[in-house]
């Protein structure tokens, strides 16, 4: 025991000040980049652009910039130009260096602190410019200010030379050019134009009257777009509803400021059954909602009920409409600008400032009440839509209760058609939704029974985009899926209760299979979106061809853009001597026996699966509505623009 204590004492003595590492300047950023930009993959790479653009947006919010330009240069570097006041170039008192140098070399240096520079700002609260500098092989900045052009260059965060004047000018603004460091971004340094363009368009919607341009100068990829929306978030709502039938033409728009907090709301009702509410705080998309959404939702419900009762559209003895009722078919965008936003939630995308509830509630209530009084015909349409939604909700509740009595939604009594797995480990378990009883039989026989469950579905499930809640709950196939997953439904939905963390859609490789897949994805997106956002949803990729020599299949060809090239290569490969390979075309899963289905599509060692993600919720919402909604013309236009007529199932 004494010897052990001596050993322990020796170990303790070895841990002294010499073992404490102090990272100077921006070394910490290069050592742990994920702490500052989230990741070093594609998302983190594009985050660099937003940090610089956010600084330019701050100038626009302060009223000093009207045009921002973003360039993807020919060498895949980025240039951001604005016509603001230009970053200060005079000496910063604390560092004794020019302010522009301090901004790019010192963490938490910028005009976002103390309230003296920017009243409202977005981004990472001042760390942005220096972080981008630290994670770039080269960064240079040009400041157009006081009639002079000031220039400074940096390499991997370090100053190359002092700030110098390189010319004269009669304009003001800042130009930042940087090249991401491949030592940091090992996965990719290639910028995705569509990712940048979508966010830039969103920023233009959120900042009324600000022009933002994006230009791609890369060889063979040249393109440019210019975004300017005088209607601001009102234009955003019109954009979101572009392919939908609206109840009234012009979106309701209101803006106001209280206690230094600015609130904007735009909203419009459509004939659909889905709600689309998007919220932002200081231009940051608050995916998880927050106090601004709380204030808006409460005001919307209260004002509509008050109007309905006062105008006797709802009788005094009738129940009030719920929030769910009044939001059916609603498209709304809420944007707040706060001098000191507090973000919470799992991904820090939930606004937490408690005072925002009452401010949003009050500002929106006053404007919405006024709108309803001034537009009685539109007001009646809004209330009547809520009443119809209420009736459907009550019918759905009755259907749910009847179903529960029959144990249809009780996990203790799983669907009879479900072939469950033996494991209780949700992290390992997989649920395959299989088209047809024939393929379902092969899948049940071929699966690994320990962790793979099979749920066969018959034919095409209900198109939930066109259905009311009571009809959805009355559909046996949909009920079976909810019950099997164990997540509950509607207000009771809880993704943490998912019995499987892989939900695999496995359909035939033909037009009908694609349609069933789309119907299932629509259901999941509309009513099980947390499962999608958690990354649990996959699409199986069964082979489309088998290359046979004699009776033996030598190679399977997976579906894809290059499937015909793959097939041609395989045929050449096995055309040796007298052997003549033949091609077996798999139109249906039922054409494969259980061993083949396991080997090609279900075996984790060999299979190919596509994970379904939602990178752009607004775009996803538009596409689902267009593909699965009532209007035929937008759907036909989309198919004509995007169809690839390489193979036809006739």
Swiss-Prot record:
It catalyses: ATP-dependent breakage, passage and rejoining of double-stranded DNA. The record marks 460, 463 as: Interaction with DNA. GO terms for cellular component: chromosome; cytoplasm. It comes from the Bacteria. Binds two Mg(2+) per subunit. The magnesium ions form salt bridges with both the protein and the DNA. Can also accept other divalent metal cations, such as Mn(2+) or Ca(2+). InterPro entries: DNA_gyrase_B_C, GyrB, HATPase_C_sf, Ribosomal_Su5_D2-typ_SF, Ribsml_uS5_D2-typ_fold_subgr, Topo_IIA, Topo_IIA-like_dom_sf, Topo_IIA_B. SMART domains: HATPase_c, TOP2c. PROSITE patterns: TOPOISOMERASE_II (PS00177), TOPRIM (PS50880). It is found in: Cytoplasm. Residues 429-543 form the Toprim domain. Coiled coil: none annotated. One of its GO terms (biological process) is DNA-templated DNA replication. Keywords: ATP-binding, Cytoplasm, DNA-binding, Isomerase, Magnesium, Metal-binding, Nucleotide-binding, Topoisomerase. Its EC number is 5.6.2.2. GO terms for molecular function: ATP binding; DNA binding; DNA negative supercoiling activity; metal ion binding. Mg(2+) 2 binds at residues 508, 510. Belongs to the type II topoisomerase GyrB family. Few gyrases are as efficient as E.coli at forming negative supercoils. Not all organisms have 2 type II topoisomerases; in organisms with a single type II topoisomerase this enzyme also has to decatenate newly replicated chromosomes. Heterotetramer, composed of two GyrA and two GyrB chains. In the heterotetramer, GyrA contains the active site tyrosine that forms a transient covalent intermediate with DNA, while GyrB binds cofactors and catalyzes ATP hydrolysis. A type II topoisomerase that negatively supercoils closed circular double-stranded (ds) DNA in an ATP-dependent manner to modulate DNA topology and maintain chromosomes in an underwound state. Negative supercoiling favors strand separation, and DNA replication, transcription, recombination and repair, all of which involve strand separation. Also able to catalyze the interconversion of other topological isomers of dsDNA rings, including catenanes and knotted rings. Type II topoisomerases break and join 2 DNA strands simultaneously in an ATP-dependent manner. This is DNA gyrase subunit B.
